């Protein structure tokens, strides 16, 4: 994969994530600054999602720690847990929000 393809794939996934957050009605504020998407919660906690172009990875930092996702078999998979990116973000959002989030 080249850098252009990497950015297209990540941007598509991050847009999906933003749409899911909007549709959930959860009090999560997505803020994009450069290659970083920060999910800000009412309790002031954050999840930071970062595009790592040199490694063609997505990095996620949350209360649970740091996680790296590589594009394998047409999905972003965590090297530490084997979880798919969106599933892990949903799980981490629930931990940060301290409440059940109804994902659509």
From Swiss-Prot:
InterPro entries: CyaY (IPR047584), Frataxin/CyaY (IPR002908), Frataxin/CyaY_sf (IPR036524), Frataxin_CS (IPR020895). One of its GO terms (biological process) is iron-sulfur cluster assembly. Involved in iron-sulfur (Fe-S) cluster assembly. May act as a regulator of Fe-S biogenesis. The keyword Metal-binding applies. This is Iron-sulfur cluster assembly protein CyaY. HAMAP family: CyaY. Keywords: Iron, Metal-binding. Belongs to the frataxin family. Signal peptide: none annotated. One of its GO terms (cellular component) is cytosol. It comes from Aliivibrio fischeri (strain MJ11) (Vibrio fischeri). GO terms for molecular function: ferric iron binding; ferrous iron binding. Pfam families: Frataxin_Cyay.
């Amino acid at each position: 994969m080249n850098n252009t393809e990497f950015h297209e794939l990540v941007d598509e996934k991050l847009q999906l994530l933003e749409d899911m957050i909007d549709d959930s009605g959860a009090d999560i504020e997505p803020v994009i600054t450069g290659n970083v998407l920060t999910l800000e919660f009412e309790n002031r906690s954050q999840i930071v999602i970062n595009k790592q172009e040199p490694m063609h990875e997505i990095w996620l930092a949350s209360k649970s720690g740091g996680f790296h996702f590589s594009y394998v078999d047409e999905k972003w998979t965590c090297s530490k847990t084997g979880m798919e990116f969106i599933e892990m973000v949903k799980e981490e959002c629930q931990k940060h929000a301290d409440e059940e989030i109804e994902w659509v």
